[in-house]
């Protein structure tokens, strides 16, 4: 019937693109906003607008049960608003003072880290300090080996992947240091790395653990003589 056809059309162009929004406070007054998307292919745009960080879902909306203000009031982050503007869902992170941010999406999970500007903060003991140049890139179902090649070209490092590194990845990175980007990529695919000078060897984590165990055994055998 025409009514059925109309409802199918409206569903096709507007659907819920979000399943959860959560905030975790950080040690330095910042925090992490994690956004679970309905699927990894939903187009997402992240823009800084003064003391607001605006995340826009293009062509998909926020479901009714998530339309709300989340009063965080934790360090830098005051609140998080979720609403719809036409066919697009909009998540607005309201920040109290000057901030830096980086965002990365792995699979259907979008993570946005908000923190004090570098000059104003001391790294905590648990925090790994990344010093690589920041980059922004997006991959939709691209071979992991191709992504590592692109990263190697960006960094002038030699990134060598073992034969057993395979599979595809969907990933979005915004303003992320390249060495952190590499760690995010490796973690998402259960891969590990070994560094030697300007060469980074990438292997599956299980292989890396076995290799390190063998080396430790050999070292202990030598020491026991």
List the predicted regions and their residue ranges:
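Sec-dependent N-terminal signal peptides of Gram-negative outer-membrane/periplasmic proteins
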Residues: 2-32, 38-225
């Amino acid at each position: 019937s025409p009514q059925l056809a109309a409802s199918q059309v409206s569903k096709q162009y507007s659907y819920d693109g979000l399943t959860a929004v959560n905030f975790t406070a950080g040690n330095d007054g910042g925090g992490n906003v994690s956004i679970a998307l309905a699927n990894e292919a939903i187009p997402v745009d992240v823009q800084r607008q003064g003391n607001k960080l605006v995340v826009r879902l293009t062509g998909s909306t926020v479901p009714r049960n998530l339309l709300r203000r989340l009063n965080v009031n934790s360090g830098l982050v005051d609140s998080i608003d979720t609403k719809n503007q036409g066919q697009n869902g909009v998540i607005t992170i309201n920040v109290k003072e000057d901030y830096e941010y980086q965002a990365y999406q792995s699979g259907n999970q979008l993570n946005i880290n908000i923190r004090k500007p570098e000059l104003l903060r001391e790294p905590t003991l648990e925090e790994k300090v990344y010093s690589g140049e920041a980059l922004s890139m997006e991959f939709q179902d691209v071979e992991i080996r191709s992504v590592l090649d692109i990263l190697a070209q960006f960094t002038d490092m030699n990134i060598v992947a073992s034969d057993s590194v395979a599979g595809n990845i969907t990933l979005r990175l915004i303003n992320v240091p390249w060495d952190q980007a590499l760690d995010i990529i490796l973690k998402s695919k259960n891969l590990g790395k070994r560094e030697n000078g300007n060469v980074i060897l990438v292997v599956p984590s299980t292989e890396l653990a076995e290799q390190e165990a063998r080396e430790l055994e050999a070292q202990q055998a030598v020491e026991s003589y």
